[in-house]
Amino acid sequence: MALPTLPSYWSSRKHMDLRQRQHQQEDQFRQQWEQNSRYFRTWDIHNSKQIEWSSKISYQRSMHAYHCEKMKEEKRKILELRRERLRELLLEEQDLLAAELDELRLSMGLREQRLREQHQDLKSAREEQRKLIAERLLYEHWKKNNPKLRELELDLHKKHVINSWATQKEEKKQQEATEKQENKRLENQYAAARREAEARMRVEEERRQLEGRLQAEALRQQMEELKQKEMEATKLKKEQENLLRQRWELERLEEERRQMAALRRKTELGRFLKHQYNAQLNRRTQEIQEELEVDGRILQALLEKEGELQQVELARREQARADAAWMKQVIEEQLQLEKAREAELQQLLREEAKEMWEKREAEWAREQVARDRLMSEVLTGRQQQILEKIEQNRRAQEETLKHREKLIRSLEEGKQLAQRAKEESEELKLARKQELEAQVAERQGQEWEAARQEEEEEEEARQAEEHSNALLQQEAKTMAEKGYQPKLHGHLRIAWD
């Protein structure tokens, strides 16, 4: 009986189905990748718009538009109020003008009389004022031209000059002491302000350094978190690739299992038929050989017995030969019969083996169906788990990507804030340095101006004193040469400053 074989187109059909499934998987993976890319692009656009709408510039633009609209509304209300107020004032002014016109019409004569009285009063007041001025001028003229009063005034002037000079010296000393105290106070105030500014700058520098350290620590933590997220993303990508390889490996193992099951069925069928045929043939051959050996021993015993009895019973020898030949013929006939029976038995065994094989094949088919169903459920469950893990991996990658973008934006904002804080710190340092330099320059200018003014005052005082001494000497010399001459007009004497 020939062994069952499978058609050649089955294997080619299997390979075609396998390639088709692989292409379908690749198409499905590519579609999934395009869907993920489209999803990420959509989220990027959404995030950029969200950032733009929630940015400070958008907020300032909205608040500026709101304030402009509010100011326009307030201006419009104020303009309406002003118009209403002007309208009321115009009506009131018109009423007042009408009343005033009425009064003018009624009191024109009374007004002329009042004007005449006012003119007369003004004329009397001018006359009175002229009299007073004339009296005052006459008094001053008498006061200036009276010799006794002039001598008295000269004595008072000398006393005043002497007292004023001493007073001026005392005031000069007090002024110098006051200026020294003021300079000392200003120096102390300047030193205190400088110490306060230095302390404030130290505190600000410490605060800025602390903020820098905290910001650097935050940036370092964010960088570590970013590295961790990148490692998680790499791990998730590797895990996804591993899951895809496991999925392809399961499909390959399933295909190999089906092929091995078909090959095993063919091999088992051939092995069973061959083993059954060989076992029956060997067993029957041994039985025939044993029977032939038994028959041979029997015939040999008969022949030996015939030789022993040849001398005793010569008459019976022929009969023994005839019996031996007959037995040999019977054995040969029996051997032929056994061979025919063996052939018939072998044919019967093949049919029974075929029936047994068909029976076992049916049992194997049922068992194979059950095993295939169980394996299909197991493989389907495993594939479903792999797909769920792939989906979870995709979502985890999306979350990791979002968090990574958020961290990158936070890092950029941190860098911008650090740069802005650094620029503000530099500007503040420069402003404080310029302020201190301006204070120092102002203080030096004040000291220089005070010193210059003091020198000028001393020089003016010295020159005034020299000029006064020269004038006094010259006047004394002139008066001594001319003698006493009365003066008609005197002049106002003042003390030297």
Swiss-Prot record:
Extract the ranges annotated as region (Interaction with keratin proteins). 72-457
Q: Where is this region: Trichohyalin/plectin homology domain?
A: 258-424
- Transmembrane residue ranges: none
> Where does the record say this protein resides?
Cytoplasm, Cytoskeleton; Cytoplasm; Cell membrane; Mitochondrion
State the GO CC annotations.
apical cortex; centrosome; ciliary transition fiber; cytoplasm; desmosome; keratin filament; mitochondrion; plasma membrane
Q: Where is the composition biased (Basic and acidic residues)?
A: 168-188, 444-453
One GO process term, biological-process aspect: negative regulation of cell growth
Please outline how this chain is modified post-translation.
Answer: Ubiquitinated. Ubiquitination by the BCR(KCTD17) E3 ubiquitin ligase complex results in proteasomal degradation, and induces ciliogenesis.
Q: Which UniProt keywords apply?
A: Apoptosis, Cell membrane, Cilium biogenesis/degradation, Coiled coil, Cytoplasm, Cytoskeleton, Membrane, Mitochondrion, Tumor suppressor, Ubl conjugation
Q: Does the keyword Electron transport apply?
A: no
Q: What is its main location?
A: cytoplasm
Task: Name the domain of life.
Answer: Eukaryota
Residue runs in coiled coils: 67-140, 166-271, 327-479
Query: What family does the database annotate?
Result: Belongs to the TCHP family.
What is the annotated role of this protein in its UniProt record?
Tumor suppressor which has the ability to inhibit cell growth and be pro-apoptotic during cell stress. May act as a 'capping' or 'branching' protein for keratin filaments in the cell periphery. May regulate K8/K18 filament and desmosome organization mainly at the apical or peripheral regions of simple epithelial cells. Is a negative regulator of ciliogenesis.
Oligomer status and interactors: Interacts specifically with keratin proteins including, KRT5, KRT6A, KRT8, KRT14, KRT16 and KRT18. Interacts with KCTD17.
Q: What is this protein called?
A: Trichoplein keratin filament-binding protein
**Organism of this sequence:** Mus musculus
